[in-house]
Amino acid sequence: MALALPEDHFDQYFAGQPHWFGKLIHYVGAADGTDLQGVGPHTDWNFLTLLLQDDTGGLQARPAGADRWIDVPPIDGALIVNIGEMLEVATHGYLVATPHRVLPCAPGGTRDSIAFFWAPRLDASLDAVTLPPAYAKQAPGVSESAHNVLHSRFGDNALKGWLRSHPEVAATHHADLLVQSHTTDGSS
């Protein structure tokens, strides 16, 4: 494996009931351009994401150290692989969860994509792996902020990500979880 780990190193975290889901995503551009649908900047809270996008485009990424967003052009039949926050935690920042976003469609246009999110069991806690010295020198640690604390226990990280992605639903139906989340991660 590229990290100089045994091929089965991460198996223990996925054994039993790994947490995965697929998502069929259909974006619609309003005919008059007033109701813009896209996805704001975020990182995926899982381990890896595989994404197949149509030929419309609109996906952008901001690689580590970049000062601007770059287009991720569709390539026929190619999958986009996004590193998730749990892989960043496991590699102590050697591999970084890439921030990405989806721009709104042109008025009257549509965009379709299929995403597969692969993650450990909800109760799995990932410890940082021991990297070879050459890699370890390039591992700055996880890139967290007060608004996005990365948890080593996947279930905690998934809940944090869900609350972040669906703030209106969380505020309406799970306000108690928002209070707990803000209390445990230091953000407000």
Name what the model sees in each region.
Residues 1-188:
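C-terminal flanking tails of non-heme Fe-dependent oxygenases
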